C-alpha cells in the first residue's frame, strides 16, 4: 500500500473540521488496509509511530531532520531553515525542498507505508556511537523517494506535529464504522490493552465476538479508573450507599506495575514506561509481589528528610531523569503505596468487586521499606472517616479516596464509584492552546497562556481562560522555548499553538461564560506546575469542568444536592 494514499488521507483530514466526515474518511481508509498493516497503521493515522507505552523513540529533532532532507534533495540546510520563516511550517518547507530537489536517484521507487514504518522503527532502534549519522542516512533514503505531499506528512510524523484533528475517540469510532462492530466493544478492548493496532486487527478478523473476548494482557497497560470529587465525607458515604472504603490520597504519581516472572515494568498514568528511572522501586517490587504474574496499581510518593511526603513534582523529576539515576535516588527517595490489583497469575480481576480485590492485594504483597499497601478504613460512620481524614492531612497527604465496596474496575472511566475528598477545590490540568507575547522587558517572551479543556468526542480543545500569574522569569523562558516550535499561526500579539503541553492551574472559581464555546471560564487562574506526565488527551475535559462547577455551587449552597 503506497504511502501517498496515507498522505492524501492526512490532507483530507486537515481540510475538514467536521467530526463525522473525519470519522468516515478514516473508516474508509481502514477498510483498504491489508491485515498485516493493521497493527501499526492506526498509530500512523494518529501521527505517531508507537503506542504511548512503547519505550522506543525516534530521537530526531528539527536539525537532524533538515540534515536528512538536505542530503536527499541537495538543497542547503540553511535554505530550508529560511523557508520556514515564509511557510511557518517545517513540513511545508520540506515539501517545497523535495519539489525542487536537485538530485534524482536512478533506483527511486514509490514509498510504501510498510517501508516508511519499518524505516522509522529502524531509526528508533538505532543507538550508540555513530547513531545520529545512521538515522540521517535512513531518513534521507525515504525523502529521496518521497513525493512533496508525502514529505510534508512524513516530516510531521517524525517530529510529532501532525495536525489532522484525529484523537483517540475519533479513531475508536472509525474502527467500529469500518468493520461494523459495536463502538462500546472497541472502547472496552482499547481500555484493557491501550493498543489500537491490536484492537483494529481483532475488530476486522474476529468482529464483535473477538472484541468481547479481549482480556488484560501483561506488558500492555490498562487505562486507569479515575475519580470525581466529593463535597464532603458525608456526601461520599451517601453516594457509596452508607458504607465505603476510605484510603489515604497520596500526593504522588500514579503508576501501574506489571510483573511477569523476574521482569517488572512500571507505567506512568500517561502509560509511559518509567521502569528505568526508578530501579530501587523495581528491585523492591520483585521481593514484594508474591505471585509469578500480576498487575497492581499504586501511588509513587517522594519522601523528604523529615519522613513527610514531598509534592508530586519531585516524582516527576525522577521520571524525567535519564542519567545519574543513582544520584537522584539519594536526593529524592521514593515509596510506592499500592491500592489495587487487576490481574493475578492468568486471572483478570477487572470484574471482581473492589472489596475482594483489596483483600487479594493484601494477600499477595509482602510489604517492605519501599513498597506499602495504602492505609485504609472501612466504615459506615461519618465521624470515623472524618477522624481518618484529619489524620491524613496532618501527615501531609492530599486527603482521602472513598471507594464503593462492590465496584468493579472501570478502565478509563471517571465515575462516582471512586470519590476524592480534599480540603480545596480540585486543581485543573489544562492544555496550552495559545499564548500572548509579553511587554517591556518580557516582549521577547510569552507572558500569558490560553487554556483549553479537552472535548473527547471531537478531539478539540475549547478555551476556558487565560493564565499569566504564578510564573517565574525562568518559567517564562522555558515555556517560550518549549512552545515556539508549536506555533500554528500568529494574530498580532497572540499566537495559536498545537495542543501538546499540559499545565496544572489553580483558580478562585469556575464561572459560566457565553464568551467561550466551552461555556465556562476560570476566574483568576494561577499556574501551579508543568504536567509532563500527562498528554493532551489526559487533560481535564469540558464534562469534568461542568462537574466541578456543580460541586462548587453545591459547596456554596446555590444548587440543591
Curated annotation (Swiss-Prot):
Assigned EC number: 6.5.1.1
Reported effect, residue 249 to A: Loss of N6-AMP-lysine intermediate
Dependence of activity on temperature: Optimum temperature is about 70 degrees Celsius. Active from 4 to 100 degrees Celsius. Thermostable.
Active-site positions on this chain: 249
PROSITE patterns membership: DNA_LIGASE_A1, DNA_LIGASE_A2, DNA_LIGASE_A3
Signal peptide: none
Cofactor(s) listed in the protein's UniProt record: Mg(2+)
A Pfam family reported for this protein in Swiss-Prot or TrEMBL: DNA_ligase_A_M
Function: DNA ligase that seals nicks in double-stranded DNA during DNA replication, DNA recombination and DNA repair.
Protein name (database record): DNA ligase
Source organism per UniProt: Pyrococcus furiosus (strain ATCC 43587 / DSM 3638 / JCM 8422 / Vc1)
Lineage: Archaea, Methanobacteriati, Methanobacteriota, Thermococci, Thermococcales
